[in-house]
Amino acid sequence: MKKLLIIGASLLQLPAIKKAKEMGLYVAVVDYNPNAVGIKYADEYFNASTMDEDAVLKVAQDFKPDGIMTLATDMPMRGVAKVSDNLGLNSISYETAVKATDKYEMIKAFEEHNVPAPWFYLVKNYEELLTLQDKITFPCIMKPTDNAGSHGVVKIHSYEELLNNYEYSHNNSRHGNVIVEEYLDGPEVSVEIMVTNGDVNVLQITDKLTTEAPYFVEMGHSQPSRLDIITQNQIKDVATKACKAVGINKGPAHVEMKITSKNGPKMIELGARMGGDNITTHLVPLSTGIDMVECTIKTALGETIDVTPTLNCGSAIRYFEVPFGKIKSIEGVEEAMKIEGVRQISFTKDIGEESIPIHCSNDRIGFVIAQAGNAEEAIKICEKVKEIIIINTTLV
């Protein structure tokens, strides 16, 4: 029986843990939280931080897996790559993992390989921030170099705002570094990818719905993209170049970019892992029939994968928007689940918990996923569900 080590045992890793067990693998998980939801589904549990590369390596040396992986999380990829380098497993290199998890190293790689991307400045402290007054134009974006899920990302309209928001971005960075970069105006998309032997296979392009400035939190996704075919081909070209620039030669990739009116697609960032927000675990298989979780597991084990689509459908997810306050009741779920095409309705906060302003992805309270003949119909189903479900709140 082959052994798979999964870094993390949270809700994000649950699809991988369950799929690996379905595939007949012996599964061990690593997580600092002994109560993580995925532990009970695994065969073995190791208590260690997913961010502690040396601890993850020690676990791997003891467990001796045939493959190692993580789903939809950035920083644990460093541990995955370190183990792979040391034990000769099938993953990206540590150098690539750093480029894919440090936004400064990433955008430098884009610049070096002529990948369309924003202008940028690395800021290590407040004194360096003060030197940017005559170098940048507004609006611009300020964000941590080493975080995800929109944490610490803010749109800046003036030099005064730049100074006032520095602490917000700085405090969301693990190492204190932030990037100030060009603001890209236009629709946002992500590209869902599996790389096999250096070949970049674009499985799907995802249209995105985000909150307005300054935080740009993702509130919806749909597939396939409804952009014109010429633009889609440009998107695929930029995504391919971006993956090659950071050195992703195997496994999944999640590439984010905006379609600017003047210069076409320009990179925001990428991850050398599957996309989160249910995009790759749910939307891709619902729209294409391709099981990216299984493909990622097989890649980690060094096995051959098939990325041929077996479906041509539309899929969508929409997150609920509710009044701020303590959640009093949630009504209409049973009725909504009866709607044709609804595949899942989930809530990440319970009755009695607080709904707060959405500044990052963790602030969202739940979502609906739908499947239909095309993306537009899938979106309509999601919006209908949002009308039926009533989430009552009371002021705190």
Question: What is the meaning of each model-derived region?
Answer:
Residues 1-96, 127, 305, 322, ...:
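ATP-binding N-terminal substructure of ATP-dependent carboxylate-amine bond-forming enzymes
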Residues 157-158, 193, 320-323, 368-373:
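Short beta-strand-to-loop capping motifs
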Residues 5, 101-179, 185, 197, ...:
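Active-site nucleotide/adenylate-binding loops and adjacent lid/helix of ATP-dependent enzymes
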Residues 266-267, 338-354:
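A structural supersecondary motif
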Residues 169-177, 182-225, 233-267, 271-280, ...:
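Phosphate-binding core of ATP-grasp and ATP-grasp-like enzymes
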Residues 154, 182, 285, 365-372:
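Short, well-ordered beta-strand elements within core beta-sheets of diverse protein domains
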Residues 304-341:
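A glycine-rich beta-turn/hairpin centered on an aromatic-Pro dipeptide
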Residues 150, 271-287, 351:
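Glycine-rich phosphate/pyrophosphate-binding beta-alpha loops
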